Each structure stands twice: as C-alpha cells, then as structure tokens.
C-alpha cells in the first residue's frame, strides 16, 4: 500500500490527507485518488439533493400542473412520475454517439438536459402524493426520505415504521410523535435518542425502558418520573394529570423536560452496538470512519445518512442504502446495489455503473440518464458487451486527456463527481444550504 499522502485540493487550494487504507480502496475499485477534500466532496453531492421541497410546475410533456421536486425554473425537462415510469416513452430515443473531440462532461450535460427527469423520487408507493424520496411505503403526507413505512405525517428519514408524526430519524418504531433519533420504540412522545422502549414521554438517551416520563440515561427501568422511581399507581395518576393531549400542557412538559435534561452530561457520540467507529449517530456499525447517521454499516469512510440498512465497503456515499456494497462518491442510490461510482438517484437493483442519473434495474451503464432494465449503454446508446468493455476505458482516458473546466476554473477528469454547475436545483433549495448556508447575495 502507498504511504500517507498530503494533497492540495483544487477547490480551496488547501491540504487534505489520503491514508494508506484510502489508496487501497481506490485501487480496489480502480479510480484515481480524489483531488477534492472529503468536506467538498460531500458538498458537491449535496448540491444535487433536495429533501423537503415540492413545487407546482407544468409537466414538460403536456403542460399539466404537477407536483415536483424540481421547481419551474429548473433547466431540466420533468415528466410526472407515473408517466415517467410507464412504457409510453423510451429514454433510449435520446441516445447519442460518443464524441472524442469534446469533453465527456460537456456531452453528458447535453444528454441530461434532453432526457426528462421524474417529478419525484418515489418507488412502489401508495397514497404518497405529498411526499418524496420514498420507497415501498403507504399513506405519507408531507414526509420525506422514508422506506417501508405506513401512515406517516410531517416526518423525515423514517424506516420500517408505522404511525409516525412530526419526527426525524425514526427506525423500526410505531406510534411515535415528536421524536428525534429513536429506534424500536412504541408509543413514544417527545423522545430523543431512545431505543427498545415502550410508553415513554419526553425521555432522552433511554434504552429498554417502559412507562417513563422526562427521564435521562436510564437503562431497563419502568415507572420513573424525571429519573425518580415511583409505583405503577403513582405513575398512572401522574400521566392522567399531565394531560399531554393539551397543546399548552404539552409545551409546558416539553420545556420542563428539556430543562431537566440539561442537568446531565452529554455522551461524546450517539449510537449503540458499534465496533471501531468514529463519527456520530452510528448504530450497529463496524469499522466505520468519519461517518454520520449510519445504520448497519461496515467498512465505510466519509459516509452520511445511510439510515436504511446494510451498507458495506464504500466511500463518500451520501443518502440511502438498503443493501449497498462498493459504492463510491454517489448519492441517493440504494436497494440492492453494488459497484456504483459517481451516480445519482440510481435505484433499485443497479450495479457496475458510472456517471448514471435516475437509472433503475440496470447494470454496466456509463454516462446514462433515465434508463431502466438496460445494460451495456453509453450516453443512452446500446452496445454489445464487447463493444462496451472496449469503449469505456477509452472514454476514461479521454476524460483525462480532455478534461472539463467549469466556470470557476475547476478541472473535472475521470474520478470526479459531476460538475457542481450541472445541478438542476437552485442552491437555496438543496441540502447544501442546510449545512453550508449562504445568504441571498452570496
């Protein structure tokens, strides 16, 4: 393996370190080392993701008003999701020959602006008209980033759960209101970072508790009020008098509980059942480095918001998972995927593909947009297996020999994610605005 290397990255011309194990991973998946630091690699993927925005805009096909994750001012074409998923149009009709006299990204940009995008990122959903970034779900309203859920309102990042409202990052739970980072909880109100608990109110960092109110840091306890043990009868009388069904009383109890929480030390990180990890909000993870909001991850680095189960052997992977392996510098991809590089919104069952956007149930794609159930395609054109395997290495070399330079002077060769200026979403509508906030003038 190569020794540790300190590199100057091209976005801000400062230094970042590439460790020997990083080089081993890059060699394994056959990509050159990155020229951007981890934070900027995350930033440029965030520019392609909008989490909680839906817009009323005309369908690019017939002008019918539709709800879409892409606003009316976006430069891309947008079809209503039901039509986009149908067989009434063919993304292969937009195919084009690869032109070795022009940069790859320039050609890809033209294809991206030509092929219609789906109005929303949903898959196998029922009664989820006012939801986005959802799969295998039913009855969602103004909720986003959910998989295997039912009866969800005003919530974000929910997995394998039912009857959830006003909650964030909720896993394998039922009947949860106003929750934050809870796992395997039932009948939970106002709880934060709790797991394996039943009938709890305003609890924080509690595991295996039942019938507790306003408690912090308890393990395997029952009938406690602000960390004080009481009898079952005393607890039931307290709950009856608390009247948390009243909004005014709810706010009063919530504020009192928050004040009580402040008396206790805060753990250095949130997470359970981890081995050899660094980051925060990690659960059931092993050998995970500098990653955040990951569930069931193994051998990961620089990964964020992989909360839907099982992600392995991946770097710079942002959002989704649900059985993913060997993913690099990609976002919003998941559900039985493997060996994806520089991809966006590719799901489900995608593999062995690079520089693909909005593709599903496909393999061996390079520089494709909107394909489903295809393989051995380049710029949406079909090739034989032999033709594909002969042409792709030539394109990668061409990307090195004739790189794309954006308006800011940043150079994009093979091994870089899509240029930031290609994003079809305005900056203030993206996830980047949440983490790297800019004013309107900026």
Q: Predicted segment positions?
A:
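Long, distal/terminal scaffolding or interaction modules
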Residues: 2-442
């Amino acid at each position: 393996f190569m020794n540790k290397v300190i590199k100057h990255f091209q976005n801000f011309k400062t230094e970042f370190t590439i460790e020997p194990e990083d080089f081993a991973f890059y060699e394994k998946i056959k990509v050159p080392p990155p020229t951007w630091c981890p934070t900027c690699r995350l930033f440029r993927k965030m520019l392609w993701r909008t989490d909680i925005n839906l817009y009323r805009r005309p369908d690019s096909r017939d002008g019918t008003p539709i709800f879409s994750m892409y606003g009316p001012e976006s430069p891309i074409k947008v079809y209503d999701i039901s039509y986009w998923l149908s067989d009434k149009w063919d993304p292969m009709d937009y195919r084009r020959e690869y032109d070795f006299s022009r940069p790859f990204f320039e050609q890809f940009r033209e294809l991206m602006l030509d092929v219609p995008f789906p109005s929303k990122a949903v898959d196998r959903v029922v009664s989820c008209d006012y939801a986005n970034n959802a799969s295998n779900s039913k009855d969602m309203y103004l909720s986003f980033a959910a998989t295997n859920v039912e009866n969800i309102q005003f919530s974000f990042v929910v997995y394998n759960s039912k009857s959830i409202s006003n909650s964030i990052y909720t896993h394998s739970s039922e009947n949860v209101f106003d929750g934050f980072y809870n796992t395997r909880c039932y009948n939970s109100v106002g709880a934060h970072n709790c797991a394996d608990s039943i009938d709890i109110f305003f609890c924080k960092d509690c595991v295996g508790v039942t019938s507790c109110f306003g408690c912090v840091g308890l393990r395997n306890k029952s009938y406690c009020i602000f960390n004080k043990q009481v009898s079952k009868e005393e607890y039931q009388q307290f709950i009856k008098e608390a009247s948390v069904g009243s909004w005014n009383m709810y706010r009063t109890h919530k504020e009192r509980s928050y004040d009580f929480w402040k008396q206790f030390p805060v753990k250095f990180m949130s997470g359970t059942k981890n081995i050899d990890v660094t980051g925060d909000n990690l659960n059931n993870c092993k050998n995970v480095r500098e990653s955040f909001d990951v569930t069931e991850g193994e051998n990961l680095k620089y990964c964020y918001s992989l909360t839907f189960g099982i992600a392995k052997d991946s770097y710079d992977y942002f959002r989704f998972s649900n059985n993913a392996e060997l993913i690099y510098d990609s976002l919003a991809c998941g559900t039985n995927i493997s060996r994806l590089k520089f991809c966006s919104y590719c799901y489900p069952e995608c593999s062995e593909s690079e520089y693909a956007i909005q593709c599903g149930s496909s393999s061996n794609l390079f520089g494709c947009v909107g394909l489903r159930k295809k393989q051995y395609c380049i710029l949406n054109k079909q090739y034989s297996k032999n033709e594909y395997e002969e042409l792709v290495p030539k394109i990668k070399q061409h990307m090195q020999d004739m790189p794309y330079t954006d308006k800011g002077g940043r150079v994009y060769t093979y091994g870089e994610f899509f240029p930031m200026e290609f994003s079809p979403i305005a900056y203030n509508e993206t996830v980047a605005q949440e983490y790297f906030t800019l004013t309107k003038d900026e």
